[in-house]
């Protein structure tokens, strides 16, 4: 079976976690896998479309083709699988109105020319079912061998509140700046660690600014004592697949999150982390975990157990292989 995987970039999170980490497993099971970036130039497009018949499957990760390339794609490709892990049919949380007819139209067109669709969560699956019956949920996952448990025996002088992500989502964290200021004032030994490519400052809490690097990602996560994932409860957020939480839990870090979308499934309030809505709840839950290292470890271990149940490459790779073999 020859499969062409189209991705947005080799360092893009969705490409790494929904395609690239599965390639070794697929190849070891007889899949002739080729990974390529989406064509951009005229020359790249000509080569891409001329080569399509060579492959049994073209696997598109997230990005949608527009007309007239969409029609040409359907004509040239033997079989199309579309994978996505964001609410691409809505505007993002920065917009006042999430509804976009043009986005929804492009999404529908992409779904309708596909033979099979892989959605990152149940909300996205239900969006697909409006246009196509052949859809399956495969969650975003991590490699349990790479994401090893943090060492809780290491004694630290500071309690680190951590967040990892990219510049497109840091605005959720930045809105919490007043909360972090008050936490820093109450707990002088607390700090905020941001692993990203852009940062912001706070006056009353020390901010550790760490540029994201793939080879240091797990170590950075293990340095967190509390992982946070604030969101806005809107359609864009409902489409998120909880990678931050899965990463935190994968190394045994307790989580505080906004109970929106998949966050409610990943975090059992009071078991492997806490839900928090307004400023008072965020301060309350942060305070509880800052003051109680035993609870942090207990919740962290529960979180890792949750991830190992179904959010690992080891659990999801066979499911992806099964989809590729569907006729």
Regions from the PLM with identified roles:
Residues 1-57:
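N-terminal pre-catalytic "stem/leader" segment of glycosyltransferase-like enzymes
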Residues 10-25, 143-147, 154-223:
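Conserved catalytic-core segment of nucleotide-activated headgroup transferases in glycan assembly
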Residues 46-54, 68, 72-76, 88, ...:
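Membrane-proximal helix-turn-helix segments that form the acceptor-binding/catalytic region
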Residues 58, 74-91:
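Active-site proximal beta-strand in glycosyltransferases
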Residues 123, 141:
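Carbohydrate-associated surface elements
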Residues 171, 215-220, 227-250, 256-265:
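Nucleotide-sugar-dependent
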Residues 269-280, 288-294:
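Conserved acidic donor-binding segment of nucleotide-sugar-dependent glycosyltransferases
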Residues 288, 295-310, 316-319:
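A short, well-ordered alpha-helix in the C-terminal region of glycosyltransferases
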């Amino acid at each position: 079976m020859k499969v062409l995987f189209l991705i947005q970039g080799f360092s893009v999170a969705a490409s790494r976690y929904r395609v690239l980490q599965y390639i070794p497993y697929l190849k070891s099971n007889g899949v002739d896998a080729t990974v390529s970036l989406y064509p951009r130039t005229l020359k790249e497009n000509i080569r891409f479309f001329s080569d399509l018949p060579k492959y049994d499957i073209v696997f598109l990760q997230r990005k949608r083709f527009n007309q007239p390339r969409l029609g040409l794609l359907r004509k040239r490709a033997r079989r199309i699988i579309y994978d996505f892990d964001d609410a691409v049919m809505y505007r993002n949380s920065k917009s006042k109105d999430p509804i976009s007819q043009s986005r929804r139209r492009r999404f529908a067109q992409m779904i309708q020319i596909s033979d099979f669709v892989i959605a990152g969560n149940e909300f996205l699956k239900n969006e697909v079912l409006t246009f196509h019956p052949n859809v399956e949920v495969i969650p975003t996952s991590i490699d349990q061998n790479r994401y090893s448990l943090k060492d809780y025996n290491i004694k630290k002088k500071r309690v680190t509140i951590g967040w990892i992500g990219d510049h497109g989502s840091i605005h959720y964290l930045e809105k919490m700046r007043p909360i972090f200021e008050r936490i820093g004032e109450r707990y002088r030994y607390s700090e905020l660690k941001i692993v990203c490519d852009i940062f912001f400052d706070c006056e009353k809490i020390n901010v550790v600014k760490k540029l994201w690097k793939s080879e240091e990602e797990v170590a950075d996560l293990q340095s967190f004592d509390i992982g946070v994932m604030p969101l806005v409860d809107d359609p864009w957020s409902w489409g998120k697949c909880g990678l931050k939480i899965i990463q935190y839990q994968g190394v045994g870090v307790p989580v505080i999150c906004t109970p929106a979308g998949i966050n409610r499934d990943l975090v059992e309030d009071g078991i492997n982390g806490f839900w928090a809505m307004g400023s008072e709840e965020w301060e309350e839950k942060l305070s509880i975990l800052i003051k109680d290292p035993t609870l942090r470890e207990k919740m962290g271990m529960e979180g890792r157990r949750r991830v190992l149940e179904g959010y690992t490459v080891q659990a999801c790779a066979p499911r992806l292989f099964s989809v590729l073999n569907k006729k």
